[in-house]
Amino acid sequence: EFRRVLFRSIPEDVKVQVLIQCREHLIKRTFEAIQGCKNVIIHIYNSTSTLQRDVVFNMDREEIKQIAVDGTKMVKKYMEGFDGNIQLQYSPESFTGTELDFALDICEAVKEVWQPTVENPIIFNLPATVEMTTPNVYADQIEWMSRHFTDRDKIVLSIHPHNDRGCGVAASELALLAGADRIEGTLFGNGERTGNVDVLNIAYNMFSQGINPELDIENVNEIIDVYERCTKMDIDPRDRKS
């Protein structure tokens, strides 16, 4: 019932995004959950970093790539019975700990299976799952990926910065300059460990430079009220939005 109320409340031009591991029973259950939703981003991911390949999965590159390919095929399988519009998003989790050539290879393999179009591009999300470097290094990685993707016009290059080094906003802005098209973040930076990049902070920064962030940032007091009531967390009194 909650799901139905939620879907009825979502404007038609807003996409619901669901995050799923590349595991069939989770993908199947997710498609059952989103029935009735008109526009959905199916976001699949798997770990790709050198450390996770060796320590967590004990798999080589080809085996890790096959997980992503199989996950993409499963999404295509279950979307056949779905009435709404689907856009695929894929994340090589722990991108910042992954060799760039392998990150590119696995994304290209997913794209080959999915066959995106200019009208319905695939989203490749390149997360700083752990912020491991200075912002300029992350921006260099984003630029390299943007330059080396094939069919770049069929790709939305997304970033997902965490804030382990306290540089999430700087990393986001430099990544946008380096070729990123989209940012994933959270309200007031709320996220695991030291949090994710604050989307409102990014929006205010863009607005101050004469760029329309395409977010309604005028009603921030109500946003704060809902946030604090739902999370039981307070906005820092020195935050410029408080």
Regions found by a protein language model. Give the residues of each.
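Short beta-strand segments
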Residues: 19, 43-47, 160
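C-terminal helical cap(s) of enzyme catalytic domains, especially alpha/beta-barrels
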Residues: 191-216
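Short glycine/serine/threonine-rich phosphate/pyrophosphate-binding segments
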Residues: 26, 164-170
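Short, small-residue-biased leader/transition segments that mark boundaries at the very start
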Residues: 1-6
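A mid-to-C-terminal "edge-of-domain" accessory segment
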Residues: 210-241
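Glycine-rich phosphate-binding active-site loops on the catalytic face of alpha/beta enzymes
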Residues: 178-195
